[in-house]
């Protein structure tokens, strides 16, 4: 089933999609948060900012991020959804940038921007600076991973540290995505195909799509 922007009456770019426990679909769209209940579409703007990232937390809040801000939606007593901006609580000297991804475990929600993470835990927001461009990020079994020009990194306390034997990522391999498969990480490179990290060694993973991958720029991926 395909829906055009004339049907859902919002922007023509959709960046992220999630399905709520109730079956409703939520989408990060240029015009805001799209909601589809199977029959009707609704659009909820975030102060007219373009949205880029979306996640549904264990608390059933719909976390959203975009250009210069992040926050969450929750049901309104009058129907529909109400928006709360979390980034308003940051010091005026802090630049949010663009929120590209939102990660969650049972305790934290982390909003990933260009070079830092803003992590919400117990109602407080902390900031983790990476000091290099972040290419992709992922949570696997409550462990936070990300790739940057420094390689594959894992969150250790309040900082990201390099994962052993993955220095090729970042220095020669730019990533377009991270995927979890069984007990391994699949690294989707921009133009060099797939790599697999098994916990100790990073190796190239040959597929029938290698030629396609080398001739095109990959920016996202999913496992079915």
Regions found by a protein language model. Name each.
Residues 1-224:
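Carboxylate-rich, polar loop motifs that coordinate divalent cations or form catalytic acidic clusters
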């Amino acid at each position: 089933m395909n829906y055009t922007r004339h049907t859902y009456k919002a922007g023509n770019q959709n960046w992220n999609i999630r399905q709520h426990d109730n079956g409703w679909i939520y989408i990060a769209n240029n015009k805001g948060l799209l909601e589809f209940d199977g029959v009707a579409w609704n659009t909820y703007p975030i102060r007219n900012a373009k949205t880029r990232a979306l996640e549904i937390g264990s608390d059933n809040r719909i976390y959203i991020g975009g250009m210069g801000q992040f926050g969450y939606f929750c049901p309104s007593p009058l129907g529909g959804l109400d928006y709360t901006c979390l980034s308003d609580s940051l010091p005026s000297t802090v630049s949010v940038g663009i929120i590209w991804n939102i990660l969650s475990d049972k305790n934290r929600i982390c909003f990933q921007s260009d070079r830092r993470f803003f992590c919400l835990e117990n109602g407080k927001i902390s900031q983790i600076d990476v000091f290099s461009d972040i290419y992709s990020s992922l949570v696997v079994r409550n462990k936070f991973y990300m790739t940057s020009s420094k390689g594959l990194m894992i969150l250790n306390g309040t900082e990201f540290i390099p994962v052993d034997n993955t220095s090729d990522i970042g220095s020669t391999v730019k990533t377009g995505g991270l995927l979890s498969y069984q007990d391994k990480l699949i690294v989707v490179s921009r133009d060099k195909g797939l790599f697999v990290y098994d916990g100790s060694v990073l190796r190239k993973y040959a597929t029938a799509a290698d030629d396609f991958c080398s001739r095109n720029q990959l920016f996202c991926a999913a496992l079915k």
